[in-house]
Regions:
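P-loop NTPase catalytic nucleotide-binding module
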Residues: 1-16, 34-35, 103-218
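P-loop NTPase switch module centered on the Walker A-proximal segment
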Residues: 1-101, 105-107, 141, 148-152, ...
Length: 218
């Protein structure tokens, strides 16, 4: 039986928490015993001495993790606009992208460049809003900004409470209203999903995986 591989790029404007998220993914999948830190120079994907010294990524690096029988190649790209060429070269190798945006600073210049590049490459993406616990965090404002850039509907998957506080919490959205919003968004952008919905193939929560799979493959 052949192995399944997915190449997932992590992209963001500098200082949005890109490498920190990568470290957490490696930790949660058991690749590293302790999550590294950019500030302390212990991040697994910051291999160059200049990266450890300056606390920024200057070239694309890759780390692999296993999850539920799937090999995930996490591709950590530089966030500084001076190294945008590294990001652009990595896109041809990606299956999906995670775009990280700070809940405090919001959409920044390089964020817009990244979103446009992903549109041109026709790459599916997940937006991860980071720094929810920082003072001034406003995820709804960030979603509104991103919606003006996106060519398809943006659907928040979680509800955040007490933003800007250490006691913040996030929970997955559920319920009929969310079910209807997901189905409507998919039908607007994916003819195959609309056809399946109209033929009663997709009507219930348990079929969301099928809806999303159709959307991503298309």
């Amino acid at each position: 039986m052949s192995k399944i591989y997915h190449n997932i790029g992590v992209l963001a404007h500098v200082d949005s928490g890109k490498t920190t998220l990568t470290e957490q993914l490696l930790y949660l999948t058991g690749v590293v015993r302790n999550a590294g830190s950019v500030d302390s120079g212990t991040a697994a994907t910051d291999n160059l001495s200049i990266e450890r010294k300056r606390g920024i990524s200057v070239r694309t690096s890759t780390a692999s993790a296993e999850w539920n029988g799937v090999t995930i190649n996490i591709i950590d790209t530089p966030g500084h606009i001076d190294f945008a060429g590294e990001v652009e070269r990595s896109l041809c190798a990606l299956d999906y992208a995670i775009v990280i945006v700070s809940a405090v600073e919001g959409v920044r210049a390089h964020t817009e460049n990244i979103m446009r590049a992903l549109d041109e490459a026709n790459l599916p993406r997940l937006v991860f809003i980071n720094k929810i616990d920082r003072a001034g965090a406003d995820s709804e404002a960030v979603i509104a900004e991103l919606s003006s850039l996106a060519k398809c509907p943006l659907l928040p998957l979680t509800v955040c409470r007490d933003e800007g506080l250490d006691s913040y919490s996030c929970a997955m959205k559920t319920g009929d209203d969310f079910s209807a919003a997901v189905t409507e968004a998919l039908c607007e952008t994916c003819p195959e999903a609309e056809e399946a919905f109209l033929s009663d193939e997709i009507l219930h929560n348990e079929n969301y995986a099928l809806i999303v799979q159709i959307w991503l493959i298309s």
